[in-house]
Each structure stands twice: as structure tokens, then as C-alpha cells.
Amino acid sequence: MTLPLLNNIQAPFYEVFFSFQGEALYTGLPQIFVRFAGCNLKCNYCDTSYSIVVSKKAKHLTVLEVIKKIEVIYKKNKKSFAFTKPSIAFTGGEPLLYVDFLKEIIPRLKTRGFAIYLETNGTLYKNLTQIIKFCDIVSMDFKFPSECKKSFWKEHKKFLEIATSKKTNSVFIKCAMTKNTTLQEIKQTIKIIKSTAKDTPLILQPSLDKNKPKLQNLYLFYMFSKKYLYNVTLMIQMHKIYKIR
């Protein structure tokens, strides 16, 4: 079924490419990545800092132009999806800044048989309400004040409530661990998860660069989290190890 376009909306992008998911619960999953340009935050540890701003290198594309790129990439890599449903990973930047674009493109990708993987900083909960019914996987961050200069606890709680309101999707939380991460931040994270959706998987993701946390702190954060939550994993970003996108 072909859906009519409601408008000729555009959004800024840095790249559309094929790779394997490099972090969290779906590590190793073949995906087509769609990277938006622009973010509403500026975290110190961001591993795609170039995508925070919309520079001259960003390309402004329409819904149909992005779909065409996805279809070409899928055709070239079809064998990689032989044993799994093909999925589109919307990443950034922050995809939810462009919710009007997402509302147009996601239903069209779903009718083409693609699953939708949303990677987000977990702050724009009002925008999430407009597309959550289409999302198969939601990878949301908890952003800590120690690295992002501001707390987003209220936003994260509301975001998690909306993300888990659709019972048929997969939702998990990623927390970047740096040398500045505090036990109080871990405690607040646990408090929100326990009071909102206690079975949501929590991924503690240590930084691998100069900001990496001390091993004893990682152990402390992990053991403390496991004391109160059932589903906690300590996991590094594998794509950085293998130097793939």
C-alpha cells in the first residue's frame, strides 16, 4: 500500500548507511542507519559530536529521498538480513527534533516491511507521543548532570512512561559511565526505573576514552544497580573496538 505524502517536508542528515549495531541489547544486529543532524543537548562524551550542530555538510532531504537511499542500501545488503527482519535505526543527533519528518517516513517504512529502531537522548517526551505506536525498539539514554551540565530526571521519567506504554515494543535504557559519574546519579536512575517500569533493561556503558571511569567505580555502580534492579548489564560499545560506524 502506498501512503500519500501530506507535505514535502525535509530534515537535515549526515549519513544513511549499512552497518551492525554496536551497542546495548541489539549488538551485532544488521541495520540501516539514518543519522539526523542537530541535537538539543551537548554532552561532553558524545561519540558523534559532529552531529550536534547542523553544519554545511548536512544534506537536507525529503521523505522520498531518504526512502530511496534506504531501498538502495537494503538491496545491496539484502543477504545480511536473511535471518532477521530488516530494521532502520534512526539516530543522530537527536531524531525526535524532527518528529514531523518521522511521522511521515516511519509509516511508509513499516509498510515496506522494516522494523523501526529509535535511538534517542530520552528528553523530548512530547514528541515521542506522536510516533511511539510505530516504534519497535526504543533505545533511550539517561543523561547525567555530571556530563550534560543539567539534570533531566523529570523528562526521563515521562519519556520512559510513554516509551513503555506500548506493550509490544522493546525498550531499554543506556547510561554513559565516565570518570565524573556519581553514585547519586545511579541512585536516581534506579529510583525512576523502579517507580516507572521496573523490568526495563538498564545498560551501564563505560566510556573508553580519557574520560573512562575507574574500574572500582564501575563495579560499585553495577553491584548497587543489581541490588535493586533485575535486568542490569555492563557493556562497552563494540563498534569502537572494531572501528566500524
Residue positions per predicted region:
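Short, Lys/Arg-enriched, disordered terminal segments
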Residues: 1-10, 82, 111
